[in-house]
Amino acid sequence: MCIDLIRFELQQAAQILNQFMSDDKNLDPVRQAAFLLVDAFKAGKKVISCGNGGSHCDAMHFAEELTGRYRENRPGYPAIAISDVSHISCVGNDFGYEHVFSRYVDSVGCEGDVLFALSTSGNSKNIIKAIQSARQKKMKVIILTGQMGGAMSNLADVKICVPHQGYADRIQEIHIKIIHILILLIEQKMDINNESLTFLKEEGHV
């Protein structure tokens, strides 16, 4: 019984992943997002990431593997996840939860920076407000979303969307894989002397 359930869950996850990667229209925005981030880093700019719930954890995961390490040793890249509990509780209490991300973007965002905004529905009000603040700051915006992209669908420079209408966890499972691929692509473009990346170049994957 348990084994059957485990197998079913893995099969369903694999099916949704296969559906996503079978259409180049889903994959090309990942490439676009990586190039946009590389351009920002090379220009001395930073990325600010944000999300709610599981997407909040993904936003933190994205930032820590940029500032810290993914697979290879290399210089850290400037990334901040909006995850300071004191900031979130202060702004949530004094201004309302809808402002917890936008207030941070207003405070530290600069022209040319990138906002990496995650929402499985595309309708999170606090994420939309963060995007609006980023636009006012003349920042670039990448969204990582699901379903049909929601209300934020037309607010981004790059929209990466997992077009799945079911449970949010299935969307998030693909989101974390996209995040890892983004970091790999960034490393390829930022660190061309890395031996493993040189191998990828020789194999025609870069």
Curated annotation (Swiss-Prot):
Any one GO biological process: carbohydrate metabolic process
GO molecular function, one term: carbohydrate derivative binding
The entry's keywords: Carbohydrate metabolism, Cytoplasm, Isomerase, Metal-binding, Zinc
Enzymatic reactions: 2 D-sedoheptulose 7-phosphate = D-glycero-alpha-D-manno-heptose 7-phosphate + D-glycero-beta-D-manno-heptose 7-phosphate
Entry's localization field: Cytoplasm
Pathway: Carbohydrate biosynthesis; D-glycero-D-manno-heptose 7-phosphate biosynthesis; D-glycero-alpha-D-manno-heptose 7-phosphate and D-glycero-beta-D-manno-heptose 7-phosphate from sedoheptulose 7-phosphate: step 1/1
Essential cofactor(s): Zn(2+)
PROSITE patterns: SIS
Gene3D superfamilies, sorted: Glucose-6-phosphate isomerase like protein, domain 1
Transmembrane regions: none
Function: Catalyzes the isomerization of sedoheptulose 7-phosphate in D-glycero-D-manno-heptose 7-phosphate.
Miscellaneous note of the record: The reaction produces a racemic mixture of D-glycero-alpha-D-manno-heptose 7-phosphate and D-glycero-beta-D-manno-heptose 7-phosphate.
Quaternary context: Homotetramer.
UniProt-recorded name of the protein: Phosphoheptose isomerase
UniProt source species: Hamiltonella defensa subsp. Acyrthosiphon pisum (strain 5AT)
Lineage per the UniProt record: Bacteria, Pseudomonadati, Pseudomonadota, Gammaproteobacteria, Enterobacterales
Gene name, Swiss-Prot/TrEMBL: gmhA
